[in-house]
Regions:
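Amphipathic alpha-helical packing segments from all-alpha helical-bundle domains
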Residues: 139-159
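Short amphipathic alpha-helix initiation/capping segments at coil-to-helix junctions
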Residues: 148, 168-169
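Surface-exposed helix-capping loop/turn segments at secondary-structure junctions
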Residues: 77, 157-168
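GST-like domain detector, emphasizing the conserved glutathione-binding G-site
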Residues: 1-142, 165
């Protein structure tokens, strides 16, 4: 049985939900409001961030990249080592580029664009003042909107160079 602790607007959680779907895995989804800092959730992931995947017989698996690696190891190849359903490429070069782009979007894009926008426009609505809630900070939102232009230009450049963002093969 798989249980994913996630938040609907968390891009890292969306990434893991997509991976689960690609592998054909069913999971129970538990919405986690990380700003509430629930003790039971902090026991699963002391960092207090989503996503966290709980798999029977394994310790809690925190973080999108750690979950992606776990799913790839457990469901991406056959027992004889022949690649069957690896989602991040077959060659080392393909896997490096897939991981690099996952890191780009999971870290850089999130910290400069989607994270600030989601926090200011969505999360603050549900937070108390003590949790960091309140009206959106328009300076933060303006900075994120400026940053998105740079990221979209980079995505456009990648799309112009390749058939897919991470390379010429899907």
């Amino acid at each position: 049985m798989l249980t994913l602790f996630h938040h609907p607007f968390c891009p890292h959680s969306r990434f893991v939900r997509l991976l689960l779907s690609e592998y054909g895995l069913e999971a129970d989804f538990t919405e986690e409001r990380v700003w509430e800092r629930r003790e039971a959730f902090l026991m699963l992931n002391p960092a207090g961030q989503t996503p966290v995947l709980v798999v029977e017989g394994y310790p809690a698996i925190p973080g999108a990249s750690v979950i992606a690696e776990f799913l790839d190891e457990m469901h991406g190849s056959l027992e004889d080592g022949v690649t069957q359903r690896q989602l991040i490429g077959e060659s080392p070069q393909q896997r490096i580029e897939s991981r690099r782009l996952a890191s780009w979007f999971g870290d850089k894009f999130y910290s400069e664009v989607s994270g600030p926008l989601a926090n200011e426009r969505l999360h603050k609505r549900y937070m108390t003042n003590e949790q960091g809630g309140g009206p959106p900070d328009t300076d933060v939102m303006r900075a994120a909107r400026r940053n998105i232009r740079y990221h979209l230009a980079y995505i456009g450049w990648l799309a112009g160079q390749r058939d897919w963002l991470a390379g010429d093969n899907l």
